[in-house]
Amino acid sequence: MNRRLSLAVLMLTASLFGCTTSSNHGVSVPLVATRQNTGQIGNVTLADWGKETGLSFFISGAPSGASLPLRLFTFINKGSCQQPGPVAYAMNDRVTTERQAIRGWAFSRSAPVALSVLLAGEYSIVVRSAPDSGNIDIFCGDIRQKGLGK
């Protein structure tokens, strides 16, 4: 029951976090933990900022042994999580995160591409640990979901 409550609070926080970044309606993308980060959950809300896209992340955790303060690298790749392509946009001008009271980490980034372009194409979002924490992909989420795009 406690885990369900934590999950509910996590999703509510992620949704509200995305709403504060833009007056336009955002798109929520679930982040799936990789094998190196089993048991963790995450979400990113994409907001339309005109010619840019704002991204508000919330993740429940990182692999044990990750260096603190937690630094994460984020990328928008061409392709899907199952069939990844090259990096289309690296969002690493800052890599810091903020520890949340409800057992998780929040951070935000921006990409120099319109949200409509991301929704129309086949792109995925990758969250990677810092080099001193193994430089491993810990989450991935496909931007184009059922009902969106073609």
Write out the residue ranges for each language-model feature:
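Sec-dependent bacterial lipoprotein signal peptides
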Residues: 1-19
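N-terminal leader/targeting pre-sequences
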Residues: 19-150
